[in-house]
Amino acid sequence: MNVIYASDDGYAWLMGVSMVSLFENNRECKEINVYLFGDKISKENEEKLYQAAKQYDRNLEIIDVNKLKLPEKLYSGRYPKSAFSRLFAFDLLPQDIDRVLYLDCDIIVDGNIEELYNHKMDNKIIWAVKDCVSKAYKQKIGIKGDDVYINTGVMMMNLDKMRKFPMEERITEFVDHYAGVMDYADQEIINGIFQGEFGILPPQWNVMTQFNQYSYSQLKWIRHPHHYYSAEEIEYAKRHARMFHYTTCMLNVRPWFGNSRLNNAHVFNRYLRISPWKGVAKKNMNFSAGKYKTMRALALLPEPITNFCLGMLHAYLKPYYSIIKQKISK
């Protein structure tokens, strides 16, 4: 099994906890090779990462992404180089690797994942779980409302097919057109340039924060997802989660902060306690004053009104503002 992560030094310890959860739940897997596309990883974190891999008798290789030549359009002070490195996994990894599992650093593996790794690729470039976004959110980056928008936190990647894809050309075209409206640049680039090349996984392979913090009806109100999973599929995923994805979601605080109140934070803490970072002191997360006041004010309203306002903001006002802004700038 070949697995990749991408991280700068700030997230290296979270990647390490994720890696420990991967090893802990896949002990019977004959071989696991982890490749970290690292950006200026400190000596201290490097040593701890290698220590964790050695403890489980697994292989870890840290690849310096600063040696990677990215398309000029991707050079930006807003995003670390590691954020885009997964787009070039086919170039950074040994050429005899034909498939790889990509995991975000905020993923916790809570079960055996060999079934996922051995999933048939069926000539798709990427297999992933659908993200919970509206039709307007897709349209702002040129995706038709009925087309798929994936969450890129967990991806089975077909490297053989990626090697034949005109990556630099398609990235340059996409960024030229949509740079001004992208909120999550690497995820939106992947969704934009690989449309029609996705295979869809059941949601238990990427159980995101919103699954556990909101009911299905609340999710529908807040996100207005289009062509999404059924309530039954989401409920099954919550009961049979193989991976938890601690995504940002409204005012929910992620579990590596001291003031987290997530109802599944204990899963993260379980693996933190058996990792080389078990002594890390958790800091409290501080929200920007404007966002905090707005969200607190919304929270004081009756729940249906709060959900309606959040839904209008996330599913319509924000993406349509981006679309109008883009048209004006042309």
Model-derived features: positions:
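A glycosyltransferase accessory/donor-loop signature
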Residues: S7, K164-K330
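Conserved nucleotide-sugar donor-binding
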Residues: V154-M167
